[in-house]
Structure formats: C-alpha cells, structure tokens
C-alpha cells in the first residue's frame, strides 16, 4: 500500500466539503460522483473520535474520577487511531462518492450527501462503527455520538458495499455497510428501538463540553 495519507486525506476532504456545500461534488479523475438508488452506504473509520479527544482535554478530571487508567488508555488509543488509506483508494471507481464526517457527526454527513443529490437514504444507527469507550464517555457527558465530530472517518457510497467494507477491513480500518441509497427523498433511520426520519443537522455535541 502507499504510505498513510490520513492527515492529507482529512485536509483534502475537509476542503472539498467546504467547497461544495449542498451541491453535487465535482472531483477528479472521474468527474461528478454518483449517488443512485440501490447503492450501499459504507462507513470507514469509527465515529466520535475528535469529540472523545476534546472530552479528554476539557474534562480530564471528570474522566479520571469516573474511569480507571486502563480504560482511559484504551479510549486514547481508539480516539487517536488514524484512518490509514492510500490516496488511490479514493480514485477507485468502486467508490462513487464520499463525505468526510466532521462537524455535526455522521448524521450531518448523511444529511449533506443525500441532500446534495436530492436522493433518499435508509440506514441503521446500530450498524455504524463506534467504540465502547467512546459510547461510555458520551453517556457520562450526555452526548449523542452520532452528532459528535469524528475526524478520521468517511462516509462512502458504492455499488458493492460489502466488498468495499471487506477491503477496508483488510487495510486495518473499521468498516461497515450501514444502509442504502433509496428512491424518493426520505431519509429513513432505524435503530435504538425505533424507526423514524433523519432530522436537519444539529449543533455539534462537542459544544456541550464547554
């Protein structure tokens, strides 16, 4: 594999995200991306990492009072784990579109990418990769991990999502197929004991940390 490009990847995708807003994404070398019914939604990386690091910085004493040092070491390791993918991976025709998971978390990324193409989606919260350590930190500070900035996490679209997820796992990345692109414009969400529709992006949960 080519050298890890996690930092360059984050910079590139962040720049791309800011440039396109809610419009279709223009990218090279394949031109405009593709986001059509029947395709799979794949998450590469674990959500909530940047938020967990912010908690470790801003709420260090509260974390040390609640959790054992071994737990905090695992949390730090999980939060700092880089998404190491070669640049060529994002130029592969098998990845027809992507959205970097940043402010507002995975739910904002799902809203943005579906809105850019005015296309419906369905997905399960329970299938989205998140570490147990990050979940416990979110519970302590009453944070929604799905609306927490992630960093090192990308939402991808593919015709063959299961194959894509397997390739990602072979590269050492957490990966899961979480849903599909659907006909219509509804954004259907399941998991956590209920079925509903995705709401507009909310302020990032990291703001609750002060």
Regions found by a protein language model. Give the residues of each.
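Short, solvent-exposed amphipathic alpha-helical segments in soluble enzyme
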Residues: 57-62, 111-118, 139-141, 166-174
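Helix N-cap motif at beta-to-alpha junctions
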Residues: 157-163
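Solvent-exposed alpha-helices and their adjacent loops that cap or buttress functional pockets
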Residues: 4, 32-36, 89-92, 115, ...
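Acidic, Ser/Thr/Pro-rich beta/coil linker or hinge segments at domain junctions
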Residues: 171-210
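Active-site-proximal betaalpha loop/short-helix elements
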Residues: 75-149
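Short, compositionally biased
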Residues: 53-75
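Glycine-rich anion-binding loops of enzyme active sites
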Residues: 1-53, 180
């Amino acid at each position: 594999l080519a050298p890890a490009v996690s930092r360059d990847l984050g910079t590139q995708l962040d720049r791309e995200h800011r440039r396109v807003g809610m419009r279709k994404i223009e990218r090279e070398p394949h031109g405009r991306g593709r986001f059509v019914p029947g395709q799979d939604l794949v998450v590469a990386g674990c959500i909530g990492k940047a938020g967990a690091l912010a908690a470790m910085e801003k709420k260090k004493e509260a974390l040390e009072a609640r959790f054992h040092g071994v737990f905090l070491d695992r949390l730090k390791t999980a939060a700092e784990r880089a998404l190491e993918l070669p640049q060529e991976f994002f130029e592969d025709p098998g990845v027809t579109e992507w959205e970097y998971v940043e402010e507002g978390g995975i739910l904002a990324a799902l809203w943005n990418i579906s809105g850019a193409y005015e296309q419906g989606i369905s997905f399960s919260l329970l299938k989205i990769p998140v570490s147990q350590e990050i979940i416990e930190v979110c519970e302590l500070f009453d944070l929604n991990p799905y609306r927490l900035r992630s960093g090192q996490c990308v939402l991808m679209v593919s015709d063959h999502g299961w194959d894509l997820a397997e390739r990602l796992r072979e590269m050492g990345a957490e990966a899961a197929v979480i849903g599909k692109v659907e006909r219509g414009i509804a954004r259907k969400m399941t998991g956590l004991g209920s079925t509903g529709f995705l709401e507009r992006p909310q302020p990032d949960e990291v703001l609750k940390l002060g």
